[in-house]
Amino acid sequence: LFMYARLGTLARRYDRRHPHFSVRYPDGDGVDDGYFAVCCNTNPYTFIGNTPFDIAPDANLDNGLTMVTVRSLRADRAARIVARAVKGNGALQRDPAIHYRADVDALVVEALGGRPFPHQIDGDFLGETTRVELRHEREVLDLVLPVGHP
């Protein structure tokens, strides 16, 4: 479901030739050429059939957020990115078209040139915006798991 929603967003007259946003972290790191990004707190992101779509191997409920920013949507690079995500084992985070940050407590995504970009949360399209701020609050939720859960 998430994958179909994500692809739907890209198909909606989305400009794949020019970057849409910057991503900034409190330490000053970031990128100014984001086309597409996914922020995760678990991995895999989704499944294609029984195959995990592994974009953030460091993402888990014990760490901060993991931000995966795609810096190019050229057809050849997009195909390589998908293949590496399916391959798993951290292959995607080593791709030169990806900016990867793990264990992040805060980040800001801001439109380039004030041009709004589409965004969604958990597969739900929320419209266009010029700024998204995300924060991770550690240890604010206790999870109860069934006995014998790994």
What is the role of each PLM region?
Residues 1-150:
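Long C-terminal subdomains/extensions of small-metabolite kinases
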